[in-house]
Amino acid sequence: MTHFIKGQWHTGKGHDVASSNPANGEIIWRGQTATAEQVNAAVDAAREAQFDWFILGFDARLKIVEAYRSQLEANKAELAETIAQETGKPQWETATEVAAMIGKIGLSASAYNKRTGTETNDTPAGRAVLRHKPHGVVAVFGPYNFPGHLPNGHIVPALLAGNSVVFKPSELTPKVAELMVTLWEKSGLPAGVLNLVQGEVDTGKALASHPQLDGLFFTGSSRTGHLLHQQYAGHPGKILALEMGGNNPLIIKGVADIKAAVHDILQSAYISSGQRCTCARRLYVEQGEQGDALVAKLVEAVKQIKVGPWNAQPQPFMGSMISEAAAKGMVAAQANLLSLGGVPLVELMHLQAGTGLVSPGLIDVTAVSELPDEEYFGPLLQLVRYSDFDQAIKLANQTRYGLSAGILADSREDYEYFLARIRAGIVNWNKQITGASGAAPFGGVGASGNHRASAFYAADYCAYPVASVEADAVSLPATLSPGLTLS
């Protein structure tokens, strides 16, 4: 059964689809896409259930969400294995994804109270009360790279705020979505509060364009996000939250511990096979002996990165990319950089036909006069050698994106200089730029989003403020306004 609508599982009425383990091509899930009629039924179910869910109150909603957390805890091994099978990521990494999903419950409850709770103040005009109310029915579009954690980061705060949800996962990770929704079902969520529709572009279009949606929360490619933004233009009454990745820079300046710096570069560029929106795509290293030494150590370390299937022993650092098509896309991206004058220090290789397994790549693009401003979503790092710190920052800012950026530098003064000038929503110092705290906002500027930061600030786009001035009874003021007479 592929779709979950109004508390019931349904077979899709569209065409057959399947998902496979990208490391070996094994089919691990089959189903049928949702038709426009089924999408409509899911939205109708969400609309019907939404007010009763809201009127339960926060404490009752939280109790059910905490029951979901218990389900995640009880099923974390199965969920981690399912994510690993369907995405190709190593199991050590998917275990951390499930842990983040579990942690999201407490963080979201805290964010609800701190960002969108209730506040009362006595004023001369009366009692001023600030409350927050849910938007209504929202769609959540999930990505394939974190098929559990990222949609979970929208769904949990949306439900806590009192919204109902229609969830459309990536067509590449339907099995993970099905398991997630099964755990929500076991948590006692009322029918219609969370609905699941699986499918490809047509299903997504039917949901995104549905007139009864009050909002849409999206994590994915810049191209799709920009199309959604255009589609929602002229609809100011609908909330749209977009997270669309980045062409993220990492600058190295004056670092004594080269080994530690190389480690942070590897974690920034190659974790998740480079399939994190915060991954470093561009690396800026000083010219000179120290920079030469760092590059030499980096080349050696990149060549030694272990790549393999999700369940390989000993465990690899990098698993498979999401698909063979994604792997071929990275080979093509590398070829383009080389054609522009890039020099391969470590060549990215497609390791096995029919799979998404690739080795990591490192390309020196210092001689390339105009780098393509593209998010190469895979383990391909572009190296630029620089002679001037201001030049490095200027080059780092030459992108339409603005998600994450970082600097590895022993000098705090260098960091503060960089922090004041770099344009990004996540800026790290002496830490991998793929590291972000769930207790902080997560989002970027420029083409990386639309100023709707998620993580701790997801509460902000899940509810709207309602300001009230109140009194327990109607009463006359001590003095009437000029020109008024009441007899």
From Swiss-Prot:
SUPFAM superfamilies: ALDH-like. Its EC number is 1.2.1.71. Residues 1-23 are annotated as: Disordered. It comes from the Bacteria. It holds the Pfam family Aldedh. Pathway: Amino-acid degradation; L-arginine degradation via AST pathway; L-glutamate and succinate from L-arginine: step 4/5. GO terms for molecular function: succinylglutamate-semialdehyde dehydrogenase activity. Keywords: Arginine metabolism, NAD, Oxidoreductase. One of its GO terms (biological process) is arginine catabolic process to succinate. The active site is at E243, C277. Transmembrane segments: none annotated. The keyword Cell division does not apply. The keyword NAD applies. InterPro entries: Ald_DH/histidinol_DH, Ald_DH_C, Ald_DH_CS_CYS, Ald_DH_CS_GLU, Ald_DH_N, Aldehyde_DH_dom, SuccinylGlu_semiald_DH_AstD. It catalyses: N-succinyl-L-glutamate 5-semialdehyde + NAD(+) + H2O = N-succinyl-L-glutamate + NADH + 2 H(+). NCBIfam families: arg_catab_astD, PRK09457.1. HAMAP family: Aldedh_AstD (MF_01174). Belongs to the aldehyde dehydrogenase family. AstD subfamily. Catalyzes the NAD-dependent reduction of succinylglutamate semialdehyde into succinylglutamate. This is N-succinylglutamate 5-semialdehyde dehydrogenase. The gene is astD.
